[in-house]
Design a protein with these regions (language model features):
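Bacterial N-terminal signal peptides that target proteins for export
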Residues: 1-12
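Intrinsic low-complexity, intrinsically disordered segments enriched in polar/basic residues
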Residues: 5, 15-18, 38-40, 164
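Terminal low-complexity, poorly structured segments
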Residues: 12-16, 212
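C-terminal segment of classical bacterial N-terminal signal peptides
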Residues: 17-25
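Transmembrane beta-barrel domains of Gram-negative outer membranes and organellar outer membranes
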Residues: 25-253
Length: 253
């Protein structure tokens, strides 16, 4: 892909970010918390966004543009911007992240990648957290896969370190529909018990074409506040021209 085409895609992603609402930092695959090991083709871009509302009246809105570059091997660079209300207080954070695939996924074999990043308060510039995670994916067949996440989180606001964990299952049960269920969380010491309790999400993704998909998700305790959540998410993709469709390469939506 030429430099001009790459700049055009990045500009489009940033333009969409300018008007999409944004939410609580989540280093993940769209609105799902457990990431897969796959990344897109070098030169491709996408914009993920989602709105989440909790029974506790907490609210989260997120926009996450990303592009895959190839300085020495493909690396996915993303800049998640989040705007959220928790216990009646609003906050905005920015979360840069870089993800690299180490071993490709395939049917009957384990693939894995590595990502790392941090989060910052958009108003004060304060460094809020740092994290590093290894996502692994085992494809059972062309339509089912298991995702495993393990990593580290440093919550600088309370100066505590946590072990991150997650397991998820994806099933593409039609050409346009995929079901996901996942459990995840962080292990360590916390003054708030719900922060270290397991978290849960399940939802359905509808992808009618190569460009657009939408997710509808139910979640429990997804940000450590012991509430029920409903999330509506979308993804807009900017594939490499004349490239093989993503779901043919990965088997999933």
């Amino acid at each position: 892909m030429g430099i001009g085409a790459g700049c055009t895609k990045i500009a489009a992603a940033v333009a969409i970010l300018a008007w999409l609402p944004a939410g609580k930092a989540r280093a993940a695959n769209g609105a799902y918390a457990v990431d897969a090991a796959d990344i897109g083709e070098a030169g491709s871009c996408k914009v993920e966004s989602w709105l989440s509302s909790a029974s506790s009246t907490d609210f989260t809105a997120v926009a996450n543009p990303s592009c895959v570059v190839n300085p020495f091997r493909p690396v996915e660079l993303s800049m998640l911007t989040s705007h959220s209300r928790s216990d009646g207080e609003w906050g905005t954070t920015i979360q840069p992240k870089a993800k690299m695939n180490i071993a490709p996924t395939g049917v009957g074999k384990l693939g894995f990648s590595f990502y790392a990043g941090g989060s910052f308060d958009a108003l004060t510039g304060e460094n809020l957290s740092a994290f590093a995670v290894i996502p692994a994916t085992f494809r059972l067949n062309e339509t089912m896969r298991l995702n495993f996440n393990g990593g580290w989180l440093w919550d600088r606001s309370v100066d505590r370190h946590y072990l991150l964990y997650g397991i998820g299952f994806d099933w593409k049960f039609t050409d346009t529909l995929q079901w996901t269920i996942e459990a995840f969380g962080q292990a360590g010491q916390s003054d708030t018990p719900s922060v270290v309790r397991p978290r849960f999400q399940t939802g359905v993704r509808y992808r009618p074409n190569e460009i657009f998909s939408v997710d509808l998700i139910y979640g429990r305790n997804i940000s450590g506040e012991n509430a029920n959540w409903i999330t509506l998410g979308t993804t807009i993709r900017f594939p490499v021209p004349d490239s093989k469709p993503e779901h043919y390469r990965t088997g999933h939506l």
